[in-house]
A protein has these predicted regions:
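N-acyltransferase acceptor-side catalytic subdomain
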Residues: 1-395
């Protein structure tokens, strides 16, 4: 069908989009009440960001969702934002911004096609399977055209899928790779079965860490669904604020985000808390996908030895084994995850630069960076915790 029969529309709120139409592109399984493969591109997650004021207003993330229609039916869509800074992205372009502004002018505003504050790989150009081949180039061209028409410096599609990454170069986007750490479930029967796959030294270290973590004077409890109460969210908000202040200067998400997510996404939430006499003193919030657990936020008001490792990493592994999930994605960065069974995995992004001269300079930088990332992953493979150190087989 010719492109002329497909129209692009930009909307500034998901109130302008039907939930089932969006999820038919992003996560059709969610329409049927199942857990989505990717909970973060669903209508309800993106709408929670919007309704809670975590995006929009003075956040520096301004929604401009891009929609492709064919005969008034939604063919494809993408979570697109105009950004006035580079915070909350986890794919860093601050050096590009500084160089661009020294040489050519304003780097901001720019376009970001991403899930805000969420370094989780997945599809960014969303469409039903039968429409993906047609929707992908239409949306990509729509993103570039919107940037050009509005004289924006650049467009960035971050934490995209490998398939999108492969196709993006032919449409004028530069390719960028990075890495983060994922745990893979090799059909383990229980946590001990996982430990048995590790080298003796790593196995002993994990056992010691778990023993020390349990000596904080309380108990560790998992909550999900309707078990998560307002009291739990109050406590977790304190944890999240502490982490936000230390890492970013201020939290990215608002307090109401957690209340709305708890109401609208309860089936996809796992809250792990450390409690003393029933009072939470530390915790981690995870999102549950159809086949993966996503560790997202951690914080504490009291710091105990190894409690972070227990709550964020080992509890997540146990939960994944018990619920037969194939992997745990523990978020951005953190070489310390390697010794705890999380192996490096490639992440991908695509970048379009409006200025051709600057685009060539960035392309050269990215070529060098990809080689450096490849070397780093090779080195990390030599320090893997498993008896069999073949990283490629474990990935």
């Amino acid at each position: 069908m010719p492109k002329s029969e497909i129209t692009i529309k930009i909307v500034e709120t998901l109130l302008s989009v039907n939930e089932n139409d969006w999820d038919a592109c992003a996560a059709s399984e969610a329409i049927d009440g199942k857990r989505p493969v990717d909970p973060f591109t669903t209508y309800r997650f993106l709408r929670t960001l919007e309704d809670s004021g975590s995006v929009g207003k003075s956040s520096g993330w301004y929604p401009y969702y891009i929609l492709a229609f064919r005969e008034n039916k939604l063919l494809g869509c993408a979570p697109m934002y105009i950004k006035t800074h580079s915070q909350g992205e986890y794919i860093f372009d601050h050096a590009w911004a500084n160089a661009y502004e020294r040489a050519r002018g304003k780097y901001y505003p720019k376009i970001q096609v991403a899930v805000p504050f969420t370094p989780v790989p997945g599809k960014r150009l969303l469409a039903k399977k039968e429409n993906q081949e047609q929707a992908f180039p239409i949306l990509m061209e729509g993103i570039k055209n919107f940037a050009s028409k509005n004289n924006l410096s650049s467009a960035h599609i971050t934490f995209c899928s490998f398939d999108e990454f492969k196709k993006g170069e032919s449409l004028g986007f530069l390719k960028r790779t990075n890495s983060q750490f994922h745990w893979k479930n090799d059909n383990y029967k229980n946590f001990q079965d996982f430990l048995n796959a590790l080298s003796s030294r790593k196995r002993k270290n994990i056992k010691k860490e778990r023993e020390k973590a349990r000596n904080f004077g309380g108990k560790i409890v998992r909550y999900s669904g309707n078990e998560i109460t307002g009291k739990h969210w109050d406590a977790f908000w304190d944890f999240y604020q502490d982490t936000g202040r230390r890492k970013w200067g201020q939290p990215y998400l608002t307090r109401s985000f957690f209340d709305i997510a708890g109401k609208n996404m309860s089936n996809e939430l796992l809250l792990v808390l450390a409690e003393i006499d029933g009072n939470p003193i530390a915790g981690a919030l995870n999102f549950i996908g159809m086949d993966a657990l996503y560790g997202r936020y951690w914080g504490c008001t009291e710091n105990y030895s190894n409690l972070h490792f227990e709550i964020c990493y080992y509890q997540a592994i146990e939960y994944a084994i018990e619920n037969r999930l194939s992997r745990v994605e523990a978020g951005a960065q953190g070489d310390h995850k390697l010794a705890r069974g999380y192996l490096p995995s490639h992440t991908y992004s695509l970048h379009w630069i409006n200025d051709s001269g600057f685009s060539k300079a960035v392309a050269q930088y990215l070529d060098e960076e990809r080689r450096a990332v490849g070397r780093e992953m090779e080195i990390l493979s030599d320090y893997g915790p498993f008896k069999d150190l073949n990283l490629e087989e474990r990935k």
